[in-house]
Amino acid sequence: YFACGHQYFTPEAVHEILPYHDKERNIFFTADCILDNRPELMQELHITDADIPDGLLSYHAYLTWGERFVEHLLGAFSFAIYVPDADTFLLYTDHVGNRCINYSLQGQTLYFCTTYDLFKECFSSEQLKLSEKWITACESEPSACMLAFPGLTPFEEVFQLKAAHYIKYTNGKLSEIQYWKPQKCKKIHYREEEQYKDLVVQTFRKCVEDLLRPGTQIAANLSSGLDSTSIVSIAAPFLEKRGEILHTYTSIPDEAHDYESDAYFVPDESSAVKKTVACFPNIKSHFIDCKGENALTHLKKFVEEYDLPIKSAINLSWIYQVNHDAHARGCTIQLTGQMGNGTLSYGDILSLTYHQMRTFHLIQAKQSICDFLKKNHVPKKYFLHT
């Protein structure tokens, strides 16, 4: 039994029909996906229909390349494929796990679902026992991280498909296959540092622009940090050429609240955000202060809407308001600086140098520290004490 709560982010997906049954080949296919390399994929597959939905395009990729077709895809996706004649079921998630998909094998029946609702409705309380290992690991971790053990969920018999993996269930046997390992990617070698910089900028620009399809309203979370500012600085001029607006959202503190913080903490980032906004005439900025609210104000609503226990409840109020407002304005894609600490700005200097030393890049660690101290006029003694 296949079902799909259809949601669409792009014009091509508006009239998409999922699940899809290929009657000629007797293959069942369903997807939750938005592809980044759509033009390149269409060219490889010799498809000229500009309106083909991402899901159907992905199915053509499966027909062309078979089980490992996801190696040719880029984007946020999950797929389920059932081939009755071969008694084979395949379940995929994307390279970094943007699209979560959960599954559980009960006897000879395999259940899968994006959320946990299916398991709550179909399983008894005995089958849906809480995972003490998952809960203990999350509680012992001081950060907001909820992924101590990849693949585990709050329920013992329910598992989450790991990033860059797919499962294959055939002839009563379940196997898990990893289709991508970043450590094994071919390294790029240039003579000059400027060549690396140019490649980073080109890649980053393409990643942002590929999301901005015509006919979609775009929103973006914008702080004064490097991650979200960089994304907005690419998206805004690109949209301006098409005569389109970029809605930006910034969380600011309630004026009535008195913040006590050290000199390095900036509770209100609006002044720096306004400087960024002033550079782009097509940005319409929105500042969210959640006046009179706190993390407990809408707790009942949040508990109903969130599948998992969470630890970053302090951010829920403004995240909910931003999403609600963006949706009301017809925005279907929202850009964020998520994961930027590990890919763009590298977070704070202590995290960066700790990572460099752990991976034995000692010269890089020393250079990073020296550059940071010089640029920010921080005494070496103070830094070492920190």
What are these regions (language model features)?
Residues 4, 26, 106, 265, ...:
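Glycine-rich active-site loop/lid subdomains used to bind and stabilize high-energy intermediates
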Residues 1-289, 302-305:
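Cysteine-centered catalytic environments shared across enzyme families
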